[in-house]
Regions:
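An interfacial alpha-helical scaffold signature
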Residues: 1-137
Length: 137
């Protein structure tokens, strides 16, 4: 799978998870992507305010990133690269920011747009990683 295909698979898995968050296999697939598939993120820590909370925007497709940059002037000043979502999560925790915002945009398809509080996302990743480790023994 090419990097672009992996990012597209991440995007599809995120959509599936948001439609059915209690589906065990989709949750495992999402954790797998969070651990191994890079997201599009600012090279340096970059946060925006959403609903009164400071969040770090990350993207699972180029189109949503371009849409965000078109409406967010400060985003156009950033250098956007592929980064590990876990590295971004680590940075935002150290900076005491609220969480990760996936695929922020003002209009269009919101099926892959969500906000994860860092504490909840860490618990989610740890739970499914531990579950998988227990199953694989």
């Amino acid at each position: 799978m090419t990097e672009n295909q992996e990012l597209q698979a991440f995007d599809e898995t995120l959509k599936e998870f948001l439609k059915e968050p209690d589906h065990f296999l989709t949750s495992l697939a999402l954790v797998n992507h969070l651990q191994r598939t890079p997201v599009l993120a600012a090279q340096d820590l970059y946060a925006v305010e959403v609903e009164g909370k400071k969040v770090v925007p990350v993207f699972t497709n180029e189109q949503d990133l371009q849409s965000f940059k078109a409406t967010q002037e400060s985003a156009r000043e950033q250098i956007w690269i592929e980064r590990s979502s876990l590295d971004v999560l680590t940075q935002l925790v150290q900076a005491e920011l609220f969480g990760l915002a996936f695929n922020l945009k003002e209009d269009g398809d919101f099926s892959n747009t969500t906000l994860f509080a860092s504490s909840e996302l860490i618990q989610f990743i740890n739970y499914f990683t531990q579950t998988l480790n227990n199953l694989l023994g």
